[in-house]
């Protein structure tokens, strides 16, 4: 790159040693080597970009030539294909319009069905609320012993649910009461 021979390199090292001294010479060599690496990297990057641009330009030129040759030779075939595609698109558009017209009447019928289903749901809800009112009246007529039986059943159910989540505490681990602790001290 610089046409420097071995003897010239030795001469530069001796001159650098005299000018910079033994402490600064290694630092200066590292700095110069970093500059050389950076310059080489930039040069390689520029060369790669130029090669890519040239390839891209060649491809664009060849594509333009191929298009001009193919369009002249294939124009009757392309026009037939374009006409066929337009005919198919018009046919599909007509089918979609027919389906849309049919769907419009179907939507109206569906709205009527939904309204009737909502009315039936209201009627069944009213019937359920009447049954619930009858059950509450029958609960009000129950005797206190029936209510007590229900309460004990509910307590047992609650205890089983709680014991599944929280295991029962050990009685032996419980702290001693004040009277027991005073007896042990005396």
Curated annotation (Swiss-Prot):
The keyword Cell membrane applies. GO terms for biological process: protein transport by the Tat complex. GO terms for molecular function: protein transmembrane transporter activity. It is found in: Cell inner membrane. Keywords: Cell inner membrane, Cell membrane, Membrane, Protein transport, Translocation, Transmembrane, Transmembrane helix, Transport. NCBIfam families: tatB. This is Sec-independent protein translocase protein TatB. It comes from Haemophilus influenzae (strain ATCC 51907 / DSM 11121 / KW20 / Rd).
């Amino acid at each position: 790159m610089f046409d420097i021979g071995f003897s010239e390199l030795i001469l530069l090292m001796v001159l650098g040693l005299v000018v910079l001294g033994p402490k600064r010479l290694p630092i200066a060599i590292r700095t110069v080597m970093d500059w050389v690496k950076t310059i080489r990297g930039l040069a390689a990057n520029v060369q790669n970009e130029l090669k890519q641009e040239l390839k891209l330009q060649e491809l664009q030129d060849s594509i333009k030539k191929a298009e001009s040759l193919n369009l002249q030779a294939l124009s009757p075939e392309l026009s037939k294909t374009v006409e066929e595609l337009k005919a198919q698109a018009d046919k599909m558009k007509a089918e979609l319009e027919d389906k849309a017209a049919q769907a419009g009447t179907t939507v109206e019928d569906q709205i009527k069905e939904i309204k009737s289903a909502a009315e039936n749901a209201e009627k069944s809800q009213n019937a359920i609320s009447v049954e619930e009112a009858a059950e509450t009246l029958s609960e009000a007529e129950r005797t206190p012993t029936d209510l007590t039986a229900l309460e004990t059943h509910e307590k047992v159910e609650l205890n089983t649910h709680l014991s599944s989540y929280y295991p029962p505490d050990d009685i032996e681990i419980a702290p001693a009461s004040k009277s027991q602790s005073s007896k042990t001290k005396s």
